[in-house]
A protein has these predicted regions:
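Extracellular "complement/coagulation-type" protease architecture
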Residues: 1-310, 315-367
Length: 367
């Protein structure tokens, strides 16, 4: 192996033959990943790197048989470092791969939804199948928060949805597969466990105004069946960054206006990402926006998430889950846009929780 001196990003899987490739930014070329004895572990890490929850299958192909298909050369895995790696890109480097055999992998699908393709104030009614990962988290039958399906049995949401007064798990239900809250066609499942981030300070000090790490995972009592109206969302790949000004969509059944009624039908609204420099300005939030948060909305207000949208998704056109609705001042106020948790900054936390807490029950904390 050569020293890992190349800048790497943008892993991808070919839709034709499932070959796994990594873009070498230094050379401006795509490289194949040389097959090894650790293909199963590498396949899992590869899928995580791209934002998928897990690998479903893997195999090896021979470049002399199937061709290079626009790729140029290989990366090899340092198998000694692999068991301790959180990112595949940390343990690969350019190599010769003399056998010419490379990894192909199939990841759990995500992001499928019906097209065409507004806590939502100023939004519009959504239609069935447009946001099939959206769930309603209900306590004693009442909608409290939104969430997003990551798999058939894991939901990503906000930690602040689970204060001490709402921790009897038998009273929680997860509702999905419908856009109307009173739809008889949606599915409702019980909750086995809630794992919230141990760094969410308001759970340690009720007077804390620090809202970083506002993230939690809900493990369902049994897996949901995937249908046209129930699908998992895609997590961001390891190297995907938020782009200031990019317009994405926030969805939820939250209040239609501040202290107003909750939406009976799922709402959707398109809002632009605001830079943290602007959002931390004295006229906005005055340095309350921490590195793992960001703002989205319009400086003049009018369109925003609101109470009851917390925990729900902020998704871009590529069906990649960028953030979780976290907090804000009022709803749709001028210079007080919605504040969101950056999901990409918690990828390793998400994967670790799912790997280590599949048998857990009750309320669990995980740093």
């Amino acid at each position: 192996l050569l020293a890992p001196r190349h800048r790497l990003c943008l892993p991808a899987v070919s839709p034709v033959d499932a070959r796994f490739t990594v873009f070498d930014q230094t050379e401006g070329t795509w490289r194949l990943l040389c097959s090894s004895r650790s293909n199963a572990m590498v396949a899992g890490l590869s899928c995580e790197e791209m934002g998928f929850l897990r690998a479903l299958a893997h195999s090896e192909l021979d470049v002399r048989t199937v061709g290079a298909n626009g790729t140029s050369g290989f990366f090899c895995v340092d198998e000694g470092r692999l068991p301790h790696a959180q990112r595949l890109l940390e343990v690969i480097s350019v190599c010769d791969c003399p056998r010419g055999r490379f990894l192909a992998t199939v990841c759990q699908d995500c992001g499928r939804r019906k097209l065409p393709v507004d806590r939502i104030v100023g939004g519009q009614d959504s239609s069935l199948g447009r946001w099939p990962w959206q769930v309603s988290l209900r306590y004693d039958g009442a909608h409290l928060c939104g969430g997003s399906l990551l798999s058939g049995d894991w939901v990503l949401t906000a930690a602040h949805c689970f204060p001490e007064r709402n921790r009897v798990l038998s009273r929680w239900r997860v509702f999905t597969g419908a856009v109307a809250q009173d739809s008889p066609h949606g599915l409702q499942l019980a909750v086995q466990a809630v794992v919230y981030h141990g760094g969410y300070l308001p759970f340690q000090d009720p007077n804390s105004e620090e809202n970083s790490n506002d993230i939690a995972l809900v493990h369902l009592s049994s897996p949901l069946p995937f249908t046209e109206y129930i699908q998992p969302v895609c997590l961001p790949a390891a190297c995907q960054a938020l782009v200031d000004g990019k317009v994405c969509t926030v969805t939820g059944w939250g209040n239609m206006q501040y202290y107003g009624q909750q939406a009976g039908v799922l709402q959707e609204a398109r809002v632009p990402i605001i830079s943290n420099d602007v959002c931390n300005g004295p006229d906005f939030y005055g340095n309350q926006i921490k590195p793992k948060m960001f703002c989205a909305g319009y400086p003049e207000g009018g369109i925003d998430a609101c109470q009851g949208d917390s925990g729900g998704p902020f998704v871009c056109e590529d069906s990649i889950f960028r953030t979780i609705v976290s907090w804000g001042t009022g709803c749709a106020l001028a210079q007080k846009p919605g504040v969101y948790t950056k999901v990409g900054d918690f990828r390793e936390w998400i994967f670790q929780v799912i790997k280590t807490h599949s048998e857990a029950s009750g309320m669990v904390t995980q740093l």
